[in-house]
């Protein structure tokens, strides 16, 4: 048997005939994506939310030195990428002007919509036909992905994440001190955000979460309903979390008690 547990959604490599091999047992954390694969009649696909080793984190944090706590203390912190290099920006100049405006408007509209993804509806057959002239879409002969799936997630999804994260960080920095831990700073578009560089996932990141008054999570819109790993990372370190709304939160958390989630940018502020 081969057992896998996804941490990204959707995993585009799963859209391949090999997922039907009887030796594959696949666990998916995003229930929306799990239901999609279940509808494809996969025998060994299961829904399993992500998790964190809280005992490891407890031991790590118990041994954190005072100077480390001071080093990683923040009013508001965000640990994550800004997707400053993404596939959408790579093709932007090759898009017709009206398509640029079309997608720019879609990004602005999606910014304040949570729990729904409008990209599914805006990629009409005519738009997809136009995009096929601009995007070098190639795939393995055993793959069953299509240009809509690829463009929604690889192009629009990561560009949306960039747009949203920069917008949110700049809004927060108007009212409070914001520390950003990233190797992907997009310095020219950030305003009054303090860039702190990278932190190691296993050793230093939990210390940031424990020492921050508010930890931010911005779920990439490709994850339709599931709870991203970053949420579990913060909670496992005992950190306070402010996050965008995800439908599956309602099955695990109480808003205002376990976590605090927002459903609009004004609500976040």
Task: List where the protein language model places each region.
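A conserved, positively charged/aromatic
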Residues: 15-27
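Conserved catalytic-core segment of nucleotide-activated headgroup transferases in glycan assembly
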Residues: 61-206, 210-211
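Redox-cofactor binding/interface segments in oxidoreductases and associated redox assembly factors
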Residues: 4, 28, 217
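Short acidic loop-to-helix transition motifs that present clustered carboxylates
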Residues: 9-12, 53, 268
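Donor nucleotide-sugar binding/catalytic pocket of nucleotide-sugar-dependent glycosyltransferases
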Residues: 25-34, 42-57, 73-84
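Active-site donor-binding loop signature of nucleotide-sugar glycosyltransferases
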Residues: 7, 50, 81, 263-264
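Catalytic binding pocket for nucleotide-activated donors in carbohydrate/polymer assembly enzymes
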Residues: 19-20, 31, 35-43, 48, ...
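A short, histidine- and acid-enriched strand-loop-helix "catalytic/donor-clamping" loop
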Residues: 3-16
